[in-house]
Design a protein with these regions (language model features):
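Intrinsic disorder in cytosolic terminal tails and internal cytosolic loops
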Residues: 10-15, 260-269
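Hydrophobic transmembrane-helix bundles of small-molecule transporters
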Residues: 1-89, 97
Length: 269
């Protein structure tokens, strides 16, 4: 009966449902995202003409969504809610670093260190295990800032270790590097998810979570392009150190961004 009443109510308001859709906003958002991804995928040979197109599509998206009563992307809310926008930036940056290591380190283990794909997978296994353990611990932590700060510091420490690592490194060093990047993966995931939950408006939680996932995907795509840029046809010690330099600088920026974010002082909801 309740479902029937809901169906009858929906049937009586088809225009309301149609008005809540935003096909142009969806198209502009998709166009902006796809164009940005195409640029990021070719960082070795940048397609510079795509950048003006990204700017035009992004500007059109912002202009259109500001005038919608039910926008697909609430850009007005994002402009006003700097804490949430900062969380997206922090999440995307953290996963850019994590994906650089997750895929770039494994490739280096095979190409430069000479490990088989099976052995390289075993070396990377502690990274996944550490991430799983820290996800459980992070979910039970009341604060938000402390886990995210620890995650950023660990990413910086892991990057520093990679800078000192070469193809003659011992197995203990290789495993330590994997663990150092696995721990912050779990902490960053649960910490940023808690931040989104605390900072997003009550009625827009689903859209806010979707934008967080989008930030993570952009980080993954950028990481894949950077790996190709640093390694070329084959991973080397020099390529690993170049990657570690970039991830180290990003990690330091992440520490500053996290420590300086006053919005993270509030606990979880």
């Amino acid at each position: 009966p309740a479902a029937a009443r809901a169906a009858d109510a929906d049937a009586q308001h088809p225009r309301g449902r149609a008005a809540s859709l935003d096909p142009l906003g969806i198209a502009l958002f998709t166009g902006t995202l796809v164009t940005a991804m195409l640029f990021l995928l070719r960082l070795d040979r940048p397609l510079w003409w795509l950048l003006p197109l990204v700017a035009v599509l992004g500007g059109a998206l912002a202009w259109w969504e500001r005038r919608r009563t039910a926008p697909f992307i609430d850009v007005t809310m994002l402009a006003r809610n700097r804490a949430l926008a900062t969380t997206y930036l922090r999440h995307g940056t953290a996963y850019l670093i994590i994906y650089c290591v997750m895929y770039g380190y494994a490739q280096w283990l095979e190409d430069a260190h000479g490990l088989s794909s099976f052995t390289a997978g075993l070396v990377m296994l502690p990274m996944s295990a550490a991430a799983a353990v820290c996800s459980l611990l992070g979910a039970r932590t009341k604060g938000i800032r402390a886990p995210l700060t620890v995650a950023a510091v660990l990413l910086a420490a892991g990057s520093g270790l990679l800078l000192l690592t070469g193809h003659h490194a011992s197995m203990a060093v290789l495993l330590s590097a994997a663990v150092l990047f696995g721990l912050p993966q779990g902490l960053a995931s649960t910490g940023n998810q808690a931040a989104v939950y605390a900072q997003a408006p009550a009625g827009g939680m689903g859209a806010a979570a979707g934008l967080q996932r989008t930030a993570q995907y952009l980080g993954a795509i950028t990481a894949a392009s950077l790996i190709g840029l640093f390694y070329g046809p084959r991973a080397t010690d020099g390529g690993l150190h170049d990657m570690a330099t970039v991830t180290g600088l990003l990690s330091v920026a992440l520490v500053l961004l996290t420590v300086g974010d006053r919005a993270l002082r509030a606990g979880r909801r």
